[in-house]
């Protein structure tokens, strides 16, 4: 069922409209927990440590995605409410393209410097291979991760919050299934967990792309031009959400970095 974001809401209807987004956020926050459970169960503590060490790279990507998603959806929603539908769709298409381009740049940079990144994030030589393997395979799905973050907000803007919720739930279940399949059944190493996460991200990314390309609803892809003002406003609007996710990356980095005591005892 479709709901227009420009409709008049009662407190009850507003809660019903917002509830799928709330559940989506809860489900996405469980992704790392699922990966951690399967990695520790089938690969051991060293593999789990490696996944935690390189995860700030994923947090960085997620922070940028959420910044564009929340900030961009605010800009697009405002224009839809003002009746500027063509401008809203141009901004949506432009911001999606910018987000994907940034994710591709991050992917290329990580693939080129994965070893240095793993060491910078605190990897020891003992688990460096684990860190590099998880990081490389995880970052290959960076565009899908970016699109999942963007579509999560833009499905709500398009009046399809339930579709976004269904895709997020399916993605989470697929992540758990393929974690088990790759690690327990196929006997893969840590790259299996990264691929499972990537497959989960691909589901909402692919379905969302098909939807916004071919279903001409309230929001869909259209030809666009560069809009510097839209980009600036979206980054400003979404900066608080980006900082929150960057804080998670910094906390994770501080927990996994070697302490001065560790450095002194290793000499």
Task: Annotate each PLM feature.
Residues 1-18, 208-249:
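Interhelical loop/hinge segments that connect adjacent transmembrane helices in multipass membrane
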Residues 11-30, 57, 61-64, 140, ...:
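Residue-level signal for short hydrophobic patches within transmembrane helices
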Residues 37, 107-112, 176, 180, ...:
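Membrane-embedded alpha-helical segments of multi-pass transporters/permeases
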Residues 39-59, 91, 126-130, 190-191, ...:
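Interfacial/gating helices of multi-pass transporter permease domains
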Residues 48-108, 145-164, 253, 257:
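Small-residue-rich hydrophobic transmembrane alpha-helices
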Residues 125-148:
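Alpha-helical transmembrane segments of multi-pass membrane proteins
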Residues 172-205:
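Membrane-interface helix-loop junctions in multi-pass transport and translocation proteins
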Residues 255-267:
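Single conserved hydrophobic/aromatic residue that forms the stacking wall/gate
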